[in-house]
UniProtKB/Swiss-Prot annotation:
GO cellular component, one term: SOSS complex
Annotated stretches, region: Disordered: 111-183
SUPFAM superfamilies: Nucleic acid-binding proteins (SSF50249)
Keywords tagged on the record: DNA-binding
PANTHER family: OB FOLD NUCLEIC ACID BINDING PROTEIN-RELATED (PTHR13356), SOSS COMPLEX SUBUNIT B HOMOLOG (PTHR13356:SF0)
Organism: Dictyostelium discoideum
Coiled coil regions, renumbered to chain: none
GO terms (BP aspect): double-strand break repair via homologous recombination; mitotic G2/M transition checkpoint; response to ionizing radiation
Ranges of Low complexity composition bias in the record: 132-183
GO molecular function: DNA binding
Protein name as catalogued: SOSS complex subunit B homolog
Length: 183
């Protein structure tokens, strides 16, 4: 199995094999075909939105480290999305400690979709130029960090530098100790 990094995912890729951590999970969306879950996943190179269905989506939680086998990518409403697919497999291989970056988020780039001039049966996607790109200074990508999250994970999913997270955890521990002493 050939693993790729998240930043190597391109539109209309097939048989994607990669390892990532779940950063966030959106609320379920009920459709007549089933229930859809949107999760934000990342590795040390980038992040991307992934769509999962039904029981699989219900089981996935922020902080889970997952291995995707046989996934695919597609453009949905001009945004790049990662999918498990009918033949894809997701395996939970760990929890909470995994180097990741939140930027760039591959699902935040808008894409133009059009027919491939060399093969009209295929669609191709090219990034749309951003009208604000020239006005904004270039941002350096966030360096990879290993985050250790404590339960409950959703409270720890804020975009805080590691030092601030550690300070916040220490404050929470002190508050818990004070509460225990008062009881």
């Amino acid at each position: 199995m050939n693993l790729i990094k998240v930043n190597e995912i391109k539109p209309y890729s097939k048989n994607i094999n990669c390892v990532f951590i779940v950063l966030d999970k959106g609320p379920p969306t009920k459709k007549k075909e089933g229930t859809i879950y949107q999760v934000l996943v990342a590795d040390s190179t980038a992040s991307i939105n992934m769509t999962v269905w039904d029981a699989l989506g219900e089981q996935i939680q922020p902080g889970d480290i997952l291995r995707l086998k046989g996934g695919y990518s597609n453009i949905y409403i001009e945004l790049l999305n990662l999918y498990v697919g009918k033949t894809g497999i997701i395996e939970k291989i760990g929890e909470f400690t995994f180097p990741f970056v939140e930027a760039p988020n591959l699902s935040s780039t808008l894409w133009n979709v059009h027919q491939d001039p060399n093969n009209p049966k295929n669609m191709v996607a090219t990034p749309k130029p951003s009208p604000h790109k020239q006005q904004q200074p270039m941002q350096q990508p966030t360096p990879p960090m290993t985050h250790q999250m404590k339960q409950p994970p959703m409270q720890q999913m804020k975009q805080l530098p590691l030092q601030q997270q550690q300070q916040q955890q220490q404050q929470q521990q002190q508050q818990q100790q004070q509460q225990q002493q008062q009881q």
